[in-house]
Amino acid sequence: MNATLETNQLRQLDQQHHLHPFTDFRDYAQNGGRIVSRAEHIYIFDSDGNKIQDAMSGLWCCSLGYSQDGIKQAVADQLMELPFYNNFFKCSNQPAVELASRLTSMAPAHFNKVFFTNSGSEANDTQIKFVHRYFQLLGKPEKRLIISRKNAYHGSTIAAGSLGGMSAMHEQTQGLNYIHHIEQPHWFELGGDMSSDEFGLWAANELAKKIDELGEDKVAAFIAEPIQGAGGVIIPPDTYWPAVQKILDERDILFISDEVI
């Protein structure tokens, strides 16, 4: 079978049976998509023979490239020894223990626990549970509201999609009513005549205003990407984060850093 025929058959099967996320299905039904067949170093190769630099690193998760022999061997060895076992009911395994220890050794001292998840969406769903349980244990169950930002991306589940600030995702399902959004710190789009430093303080004050509107006794956390990736790789002004941290500290509100890039 020649490569073109095989690619056409794969595209047809893909169109018939494979439901893709974040896809224009009308366009896909008419024109098909790309079949990625292999990868090497920082490049992917499609079934038409095109070599493409993978600037997205898979989906941000292959930043070490595709040709690390040590990683491949470690995966193969682990599949032979113990492909999977859960960590419920006080169970663990050597790789999980060693990885948790290594991660905490590289983090600031107060980051001393690791909870493993399968995706960013799952991680942020879990963050909501952690935040709510934290304030329940402190005797403040009324602190449940979470503030996020417009144009943010925090995942695609109902909870993570609600945390995100992309309106197209909110049109697909009803969001969670305890999640609220403020303006993003996008100086180039929203700064107007303000300097970068002035805009950073203005954007941080949007958080303070929202907390005052909702009631600091009801707001549990603020979630944000240090750099907004999917929103356009938006880097806040230097004045933004120190002002945000001060606002949160003064009001007993947690900060969830959704850091990917």
Segments and roles (model prediction):
Residues T4-T7, K51-K140, I147:
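Glycine-rich loop-to-alpha-helix module at the N-terminal edge of alpha/beta enzyme cores
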Residues D14, V75, I247-L248:
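A generic structural signal for well-ordered alpha-helical segments
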Residues G33-A55:
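Active-site and channel-lining beta-strand-loop segments
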Residues S101-A221:
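PLP-dependent aspartate aminotransferase-fold enzymes
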Residues Q228-A230:
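Alpha-helical transmembrane segments of integral membrane proteins
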Residues I234-I261:
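Catalytic PLP-binding core of fold-type I/II PLP enzymes
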